[in-house]
Design a protein with these regions (language model features):
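Conserved short beta-strand edge segments in small beta-sheet-based binding/regulatory domains
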Residues: 273-281
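Midchain, well-structured core segments that form catalytic/ion-binding scaffolds
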Residues: 151-152, 156-268, 283
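Acidic/His- and Gly-rich active-site-bordering loop/insert found
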Residues: 2-110
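Zn-dependent metallopeptidase/amidohydrolase metal-coordination segment
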Residues: 8, 301-302, 306-370
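Buried hydrophobic packing segments
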Residues: 50, 122-132, 161, 324, ...
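Active-site metal-coordination/substrate-binding segment of hydrolases
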Residues: 78-142, 147, 343-346, 350-355
Length: 371
């Protein structure tokens, strides 16, 4: 079946590339909410276009509240496999050599905002499903491609959708890297707050613990580490002002074994007299045992297609896996491909588009063999 999948993906590749260009030509940055458009009209229009393309391929489609788009195929089973990703994109930064919303092909590479993060990979998953359908494979379980519209700015779309809908039995999000990710760090924001009239304490705190520090986690007393993830990372420190209160927000990318209560207690130890510490927001870590069916199968799939070691790894990144149960990050970036998604001249090679579609089609097939 693997060779048939590889051949079928090759036949579909020209159409896949053209559809990626079409969807990347749409500006889907979040803008102000409007009636019927919770994350702005631009991303709603992009969602509808993606569903229109999928419908034209013969799939069942559903737009759920202009927040989530569902593409379905297979028997009417209660449980389902899923690929979950997003159509919203980050803002334009830096100087681009091409128009970020005119997908440009040059020397076998596509350039556009969202081509890698995450429109291109999601269309690889859509065409992976199409390849299996074209091969006449009889699906034992329903498969869904789930398009989101708010991953970059809060993941409120999936939090909202899964309040009333069943989580997938198994699946992945193509919004990270290869090989399969078995664990993601948590992401927490803590606030040091104090009255505005005590702002001098804030400046003293900044001078002592934040400014000119090479390692914020060490200077703040939260340099915890474990074998799985390594060291806790305080990655951002920003001043804020809120009415009669001011302070500092710290964002930590923390190992799964590090308790938030323990981190908060450590941060409190260095408070100035009028300061307090509070947890402002948190996304829990994602952790799967490495011998689970999902992780082992995706390791095998990667190794079969790429002919190289596919041992599962961890990541500091954050994806829909934090809010959608039973899915892991899997692709699309290959080894050595870093810092592409949010940068100027975002790119994805056509050969990588083809390889991703092969991997995802084979992943759907192999996961269904054990169900």
């Amino acid at each position: 079946m693997k060779e048939k999948i590889i051949k079928q993906v090759g036949e579909l590749l020209p159409s896949l590339v053209e559809d990626i260009k079409t969807i990347c030509n749409m500006d889907s940055r979040q803008d102000e909410a409007a009636p019927g458009h919770p994350f702005g009209k631009r991303v709603t229009d992009c969602l509808n276009k993606a569903l229109e393309i999928a419908g034209g391929m013969g799939f069942e489609t559903e737009n759920v509240g202009n927040q989530v788009g569902i593409v379905s195929y297979g028997p009417d089973t209660e449980e389902y496999l899923a690929c979950v990703g997003h159509l919203d994109v980050v803002d334009i930064n830096g100087v681009w050599k091409t128009d970020p919303f005119v997908c440009t092909e040059k020397d076998g590479t596509l350039y556009a905002r969202g081509v890698l993060d995450n429109k291109g990979p999601m269309f690889c998953c859509l065409y992976a499903l199409k390849a299996l359908v074209d091969l006449g494979y009889e699906f034992p379980i329903k498969v869904k491609i789930i398009f989101g519209t708010n991953e970059e700015t809060g993941m409120e779309d999936m939090k909202w959708y899964f309040k009333d809908h069943k989580y997938p039995k198994l699946g992945w999000t193509p919004d990270c890297k290869y090989p399969v990710i078995y664990a993601e760090r948590g992401r927490a924001a803590f606030r040091y707050s104090l009255p505005r009239e005590e702002v001098g304490e804030l400046f003293a705190f900044m001078n002592e613990f934040v400014l000119n520090q090479n390692d914020l986690s060490a200077s703040l007393g939260v340099d915890y580490s474990d074998e799985e993830f390594g060291k806790n990372q305080v990655r951002k420190a920003e001043l804020f002002e809120d009415g009669d209160t001011c302070g500092l927000t710290l964002v930590s990318s923390y190992p799964a074994s590090y308790s938030l209560d323990t981190m908060k207690e450590s941060l409190e130890k260095i408070c100035k007299p009028h300061m307090s510490v509070s947890l402002d927001s948190n996304l829990d870590p994602v952790f799967f045992e490495r011998d689970t069916y999902l992780v082992k199968t995706l390791e095998h799939v990667y190794e079969e297609i790429m002919q190289e070691d596919g041992s599962a790894v961890t990541t500091t990144g954050g994806s829909y896996a934090k809010v959608v149960k039973n899915i892991v990050p899997f692709g699309p970036s290959f080894k050595g491909q870093k810092g592409i998604g949010h940068m100027p001249d975002e790119w994805m090679r056509i050969c990588d588009i083809e390889k991703n579609a092969q991997i995802y089609a084979y992943a759907f097939y192999e996961l269904m063999q054990g169900l």
